Amino acid sequence: MKEAFVFLLCLTNKFPKKFNSCSKKKETLYVLGLVLLVSFIEAPVTKPNFGKFIECLRDRTTPENPITDVISIADNSTTFLSSYVSYTKNKRFSSPNFKKLLAIIAAKHVSHVQATVVCAKSNGIQLRIRSGGHDNEGFSYMSSVPFVILDMHNLRSIDVNLSRKNAWVQAGATLGELYVKINEASQTLAFPAGVCPTVGAGGHISGGGFGNLMRKFGITVDHVIDAQIIDVNGKLLNRAAMGEDLFWAIRGGGSSFGVILSWKINLVEVPKILTVFKVNKTLEQGGTDILYKWQLVANKLPDSLFITAWPRTVNGPKPGERTVAVVFYAQFLGPTDKLMEIMDQSFPELGLGREDCHEMSWLNTTLFWANYPAGTPKSILLDRPPTNSVSFKSKSDFVKKPIPKKGLEKLWKTMFKFNSSVSLQFNPYGGVMDRIPATATAFPHRKGNLFKVQYSTMWFDANATESSLAMMNELFEVAEPYVSSNPREAFFNFRDIDIGSNPSGETNVDEAKIYGSKYFLGNLKRLMDVKAKYDPDNFFKNEQSIPPVRVK
């Protein structure tokens, strides 16, 4: 980049005062060069040297914390494949790219993380950072240039401070582990995060993780009060050392700024007894009408009540027929009696009965939301399944005004065309989400949204991949008239390569602005500026990372 700039300066110095045809060619060359310089941000080119990378790792760690036993060299061995697949949660990406993936570093100590960052950078090797492996597009463990995976799953400690009602959680800990640890300390403390217990805390929190407590308490990043991060120079920084601009960026801006080691989070107070319910309404039972009414009330209900709607395709009432069942899941921070009062007054169309309601502790609600049957032991939240046999694709949208019934019917018609399992998830906004400024953290999707949509499809047969992805694009296109626009907003934690991406080894700023404006809205400029300050050579990058661009 520096050499290109010097070259451009040389051209300008050679321009004569009076332009002739030759000088005009030079002027054109200058302009083209300047455009390329501004449009592409690349790290200084260093030819990848894996041998020196390994040597560097050994030199930068101590005998007390040796790194050699956490290095898995990429080969076709059972050991390496197990290391790769164990935290590859999307079967679409379960086959490693042996031509580009050089090794997996499953760090067990902070020095392993520091050494991996410094040695990868100095030896021209790209770094991908993986905690739980739930990246929808595989960006945390896939690349088309020589790279290593820094796997954080061994760094999973959780320290709850009951008196201060906060906790330190390392990036490799799962949400299930965090929930159990909190419950061991107190039955009336909780953390507002997601429903999948195997998701890693590192990526979930850094992308602005949401969950069923969001209307009452907000999302994960609203409760982060400190963090530990390894920067591009291998330095360990906390909030005080990194500064407020970087601390702001990592709360919702993802992994473009460094490697998150741990988060310090505030815990929230919940009652001893919560109430949950699950009610199904098929199209034949008036599901479309009830869902339309849900759009009118879900974001206006008391903050303590969260009702999400999941339309999905199921077998119809007759053999060979298919229909849509809208599944309403809910959680109320209180007893059944109070919940029934609210529902009878605000949403009687659902026809909720007392027999549908179940009172339980907060920890047991996490089992309910993870679709475990009643009576499942809490210890299952600590499980880390070694493989995932399902391929999936997700997309997201934000809805500002109710989708008309005709629009919903168009969605159902398109869903029937899928050969694979397909569902939508409507998560309501309102409550405290309307009261937190869009600029409070890097996560911008706040006031003005009725609900967020997640589109999901899953399949087992690898031969169904192409058709499943094509159908998702068709469904997304059908939904376009009914969702946000200019830009069409997207949720960063639901990575979607279709909304814009860059090649693995370079970052086109114009392309980055396309996907970046959808994920981060007006916060993108500030994020690019922070990136330019802390990672000017763009070392921490992937197909949808934030480019380093100084913004005046």
Swiss-Prot record:
Residues 93-270 form the FAD-binding PCMH-type domain. It is found in: Secreted, Cell wall. Probable flavin-dependent oxidoreductase. The FAD cofactor is bound via a bicovalent 6-S-cysteinyl, 8alpha-N1-histidyl FAD linkage. This is Berberine bridge enzyme-like 6. The keyword tRNA-binding does not apply. It comes from the Eukaryota. Its cofactor is FAD.
